[in-house]
Amino acid sequence: MADKINVALIGQGFMGRSHSNAWGQVAKFFDPPLNPIMHTVYGMQGENPQVFAEKWGWKNASTDWDALVKSPEIGIVDIVTPNFMHAPPAKAAIAAGKPCACEKPIAGTLAEAREMAEAAQKAKVDTFVWFNYRRAPAVAFAHQLVKQGVIGEIRHIRASYLQDWADESVPFAWRFKKELAGSGSHGDLNAHIIDMTRFVSGLEIETVCGAIAETFVKQRKIIEQDSGGGIVTDEQMRYAKADAGTAKMGEVTVDDAVLFLVKYNNGAVGSYEAARQATGNQNANGWEINGTKGSLKFNFESMNTLEYYDATRPRGVQGWTTIMCTHGGDHPYVANYWPDAHIIGYEHCFTSMAYDILLKLAGKEPTVPLPDFNDAYQTQRVLEAAMLCAEEKRWINLADVK
């Protein structure tokens, strides 16, 4: 029988539900070397964490994250709070010598991200960052194909993450406040596609240019559930329209859209685009990678498929092939879920990552590489470089962004 490890969840909300589901489901679909026990969830006084605990299967609830992180009963700390609250519990977990998993971006500022990565490296503590899209079978398979040299030398990468939920009717919330979120679409969406393309291609961004950052909606109405600090849940933000609020307006201090160009360490070039008001794109999270022997293309709105172009075939029969990444013998993770061709969904990426985390903690190799605090710090450096480029209107060398 597998050894047990007690999990503490710091935070609730959208990601709290996603992570709770993953920790609760992982031992049902996989045979992890450690059995995760959903020990305690933390929430602020007004969040009523006891209700969350009862609904999502946590044995205990707490309103004191510091005591929870330091408790000798806790084996791993998982952080899902708003971005500005990531660093304190993460540093406390590292100081206590405990493995720490954290949502992305790992911090609201580059300085905090660097401090967290350095602390983890110094303490030699295992850390993990929930760049969950790495665990989509199609993305993990693409990573394997590139490592095998299937598409040859990479020349171009185009990545975009487009959503359309943040129109003028959406009220003010923490996601629109820089001191709480760090950034808008940039940290929320570009962070994912920077990590995904870094993971799939194996390339590092060396320079950034041509960046544009824009905020289209400068003010948003504060809804009644908000006490004035912008701390409302994602559900309140997305489903309570602005006419449910008061006459008071909140100043939006983050971006609605950020676009930028890059050059990679092998000489390849690329582009990135993140937007929350790209009408018609509900969760169009995708990329295309072009190599000398072929290309790969992915869009999360069709997450079970990967597009592959084989340029080594005779010219007369060349064309894009749609691969259903649902075959347990060939595609990562899917054998542990449903029979072949029975598709999986968003939540399974988290469950698969929980499994790989447990493998790593038991000294075993994960299915594909897990992102740690240093990986997230490298992503944060690119985010910072793009914003510097947008502000200063010049090329930015990543070597100068630390």
Describe each PLM feature range:
Residues 15, 133-251, 306, 393:
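Predominantly a Rossmann-like dinucleotide-binding segment in NAD(P)-dependent oxidoreductases
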Residues 35-39, 360-378:
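Glycine- and charged-residue-rich phosphate/anionic-cofactor binding loop of Rossmann-like
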Residues 75-76, 82-134, 149:
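Beta-strand-loop-alpha-helix segment that lines the small-molecule cofactor/substrate pocket
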Residues 31, 60-73:
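Short acidic low-complexity segments
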Residues 36-40, 59, 75-77, 184:
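Short active-site oxyanion
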Residues 1-56:
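N-terminal Rossmann-like dinucleotide-binding module
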Residues 191, 273-282, 342:
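Glycine-rich phosphate/pyrophosphate-binding beta-alpha loops
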